[in-house]
């Protein structure tokens, strides 16, 4: 298994191909990767390290690359779930990013998971059912995640607030930051929503 590649960035491809090429000792490795990761890469020609997972198919070998071992390991768990192949695994990481994806699975937020292109309600349910316990154990130690998403409202209220804020045009990253910043005292859904909007309106 190829655990990671360290070399120089040669090329980046966007869109459906969504990949990067890394030159290691004169050999170029094409690695499929989430667009979120591609946006974080250094300029062409600069050194880069990519954490990889090799998928063996009947006619080809495909390397998938990520910015951290934790992101790679979550991808490996995602593609073990029935109905979730590498393409959907990348789509999930593109839609949410690592901390938000783990939070959505652990809190069984099926509606949020279903926002991923290609992920229907049943697939989202399977993700939550099969990965909830495993990812819950990882939340505190995920490498390169922002901060643990353990605060904020309880799961049932969080789902309602998140969906309402998404409908208002806020990003998942903005929403998670707002909910984490609010005091964790019990309050109705309407108050969580109001306080989150107030917090977000004050951000630059």
From Swiss-Prot:
Residues 68-146 are annotated as: Domain II. It is found in: Cytoplasm. Its main location: cytoplasm. Keywords: Cytoplasm, DNA damage, DNA recombination, DNA repair, DNA-binding. InterPro entries: DNA_helicase_Holl-junc_RuvA_I, NA-bd_OB-fold, RuvA, RuvA_2-like, RuvA_C, RuvA_C_sf. GO terms for cellular component: cytoplasm; Holliday junction helicase complex; Holliday junction resolvase complex. GO terms for biological process: DNA recombination; DNA repair. Residues 147-156 are annotated as: Flexible linker. The keyword Transcription regulation does not apply. Residues 156-204 are annotated as: Domain III. One of its GO terms (molecular function) is ATP binding. Residues 1-67 are annotated as: Domain I. Pfam families: HHH_5, RuvA_C, RuvA_N. Gene3D superfamilies: 5' to 3' exonuclease, C-terminal subdomain (1.10.150.20), Nucleic acid-binding proteins (2.40.50.140). The RuvA-RuvB-RuvC complex processes Holliday junction (HJ) DNA during genetic recombination and DNA repair, while the RuvA-RuvB complex plays an important role in the rescue of blocked DNA replication forks via replication fork reversal (RFR). RuvA specifically binds to HJ cruciform DNA, conferring on it an open structure. The RuvB hexamer acts as an ATP-dependent pump, pulling dsDNA into and through the RuvAB complex. HJ branch migration allows RuvC to scan DNA until it finds its consensus sequence, where it cleaves and resolves the cruciform DNA. Belongs to the RuvA family. Homotetramer. Forms an RuvA(8)-RuvB(12)-Holliday junction (HJ) complex. HJ DNA is sandwiched between 2 RuvA tetramers; dsDNA enters through RuvA and exits via RuvB. An RuvB hexamer assembles on each DNA strand where it exits the tetramer. Each RuvB hexamer is contacted by two RuvA subunits (via domain III) on 2 adjacent RuvB subunits; this complex drives branch migration. In the full resolvosome a probable DNA-RuvA(4)-RuvB(12)-RuvC(2) complex forms which resolves the HJ. Has three domains with a flexible linker between the domains II and III and assumes an 'L' shape. Domain III is highly mobile and contacts RuvB. HAMAP family: DNA_HJ_migration_RuvA (MF_00031). NCBIfam families: ruvA (TIGR00084). This is Holliday junction branch migration complex subunit RuvA. The lineage of its organism: Bacteria, Bacillati, Cyanobacteriota, Cyanophyceae, Synechococcales.
């Amino acid at each position: 298994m190829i655990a990671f590649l360290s070399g120089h960035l040669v090329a980046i491809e966007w869109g459906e191909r969504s990949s990067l090429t890394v030159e290691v000792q004169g050999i170029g490795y094409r690695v499929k990767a989430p667009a979120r990761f591609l946006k974080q890469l250094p300029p062409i020609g600069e050194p880069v390290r990519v954490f990889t997972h090799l998928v063996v198919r009947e006619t080809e070998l495909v390397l998938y690359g990520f910015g951290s071992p934790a992101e790679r390991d979550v991808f490996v768990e995602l593609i073990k779930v029935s109905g979730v192949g590498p393409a959907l695994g990348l789509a999930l990481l593109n839609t949410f990013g690592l901390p938000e994806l783990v939070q959505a699975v652990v809190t069984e937020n099926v509606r949020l998971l279903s926002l991923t292109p290609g992920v229907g309600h049943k697939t989202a349910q399977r993700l939550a059912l099969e990965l909830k316990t495993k990812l819950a154990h990882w939340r505190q130690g995920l490498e390169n995640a922002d901060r643990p998403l353990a605060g904020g409202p309880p799961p049932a209220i969080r789902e309602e607030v998140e969906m309402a804020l998404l409908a208002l045009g806020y990003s998942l990253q903005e929403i998670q930051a707002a909910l984490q910043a609010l005091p964790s005292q019990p309050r109705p859904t309407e108050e969580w929503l109001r306080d989150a909007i107030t917090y977000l309106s004050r951000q630059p």
